[in-house]
Amino acid sequence: MEKIASFTINHLELLPGVYVSRQDKFGDTVLTTFDIRMNRPNFEPTMNTAEMHAIEHLAATFLRNHKDYADKTVYFGPMGCRTGFYLILHGDYKSKDIVPLLTELYKFMAEFEGDIPGASAKDCGNYLDMNLPMAKYLANKFLNDILLNITEKNLVYPN
């Protein structure tokens, strides 16, 4: 079997950032999948499931209620390796195009107070596995370390 595209990225050189993972075309429709890499793979500890789960709930809710992106948001969810998330948007985008959206999102998550949306037994299959304080810490770290100081090396996959 052929290696899928995401396994051809050199993860030893990959830095935290926002990358276009792939674009899929269906007739006139384009779906852009973003790699939102919050941790440096194989160098930093991975995120735990509890904070990732909290980020997933907060981000999915924020994006699906966003005035400009609600109708363009297809999916937001965790990577199996626990170093980041995938965001799929309807449209033809470059990484830099969504930095303002992600800055807004990560600021929202870093400052979030209250009950995590959907964090109940009725709404979620694993609602007890959430860690809001750690999710806020990680969102704030990614916001300040990466999004507010983003450079080309955090927007384009390494060769």
UniProtKB/Swiss-Prot annotation:
It is an enzyme of class 4 (lyase). It holds the Pfam family LuxS. The keyword RNA-binding does not apply. The keyword Metal-binding applies. Keywords: Autoinducer synthesis, Iron, Lyase, Metal-binding, Quorum sensing. Fe cation binds at H53, H57, C124. Its EC number is 4.4.1.21. GO terms for molecular function: iron ion binding; S-ribosylhomocysteine lyase activity. GO terms for biological process: quorum sensing. Binds 1 Fe cation per subunit. Its cofactor is Fe cation. InterPro entries: LuxS_sf (IPR037005), Metalloenz_LuxS/M16 (IPR011249), S-ribosylhomocysteinase (IPR003815). It catalyses: S-(5-deoxy-D-ribos-5-yl)-L-homocysteine = (S)-4,5-dihydroxypentane-2,3-dione + L-homocysteine. Involved in the synthesis of autoinducer 2 (AI-2) which is secreted by bacteria and is used to communicate both the cell density and the metabolic potential of the environment. The regulation of gene expression in response to changes in cell density is called quorum sensing. Catalyzes the transformation of S-ribosylhomocysteine (RHC) to homocysteine (HC) and 4,5-dihydroxy-2,3-pentadione (DPD). NCBIfam families: PRK02260.1-4. Homodimer. Belongs to the LuxS family. This is S-ribosylhomocysteine lyase. It comes from Clostridium beijerinckii (strain ATCC 51743 / NCIMB 8052). The gene is luxS.
